[in-house]
């Protein structure tokens, strides 16, 4: 078994078979990253392939863009997802558009890794989940892993993809799954998705994972909230499908529609604020495709429409109780 940190090191090592793959960002070289996800990689692969950058997210992204359109496959790290916004112009206006702008002559195989979400008492600027700010941008692919196993498979697919990929990593899950209890810090040692093969394997971008199978409600989530939903379903006593979306763009429409058509009920759970969150896009898409099969309104359990708080973090993040309440409401109709 291994942690997400160890998995990340294995994945980059595995992808290093392609000498065009390089990794850089703030503190990722000598120090091994603020969460130690690149620990030992510089020593193994050399300073020319794993190196530190200045504290400039815009500069990191711009450098990766130039490298990408000239034949390299950069894997960059934005130290926290909250810090990605100085790089927004380079990601949205350059990386995402170069294939279309050049008529397919150029492409930009850049993977942008960034720790996201709450659960570490990071306050306003170390806790956000800004995935919906990128799912709205044509030309980008957006991934949000949840376990060591899918983190490796998805990251290899992202690195080998010819388009830019935003790869969100739930920082609360680096050392173990998060079931919603801030006082309990489990490790990955006993989780079935913690076993990470040493061999090269990929999980296709756009494929969801059916984590739990049931027949009375469909619960959809991604990142750390997948484990919160797992706990909620267990405690609710309601038979539910739990879908770990894994990739938000493109998302697995077929798997979701098949499940909601079967259960007739749906709960979508994410950490980001409710208004204009990706759950709203999913709810609209599900309603368009499953209207005649829905037995109750689609429920969303999300963060609140406020900046991420520090002292009341556990009231902000969706917990099992809120998810259970939503599941029960779907059964009352």
Say what each PLM segment does:
Residues 3, 41, 46-48:
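Flexible, compositionally biased loop and terminal segments
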Residues 1-8, 12:
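Single conserved hydrophobic/aromatic residue that forms the stacking wall/gate
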Residues 14, 63, 154-158, 258-259, ...:
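CheY-like receiver
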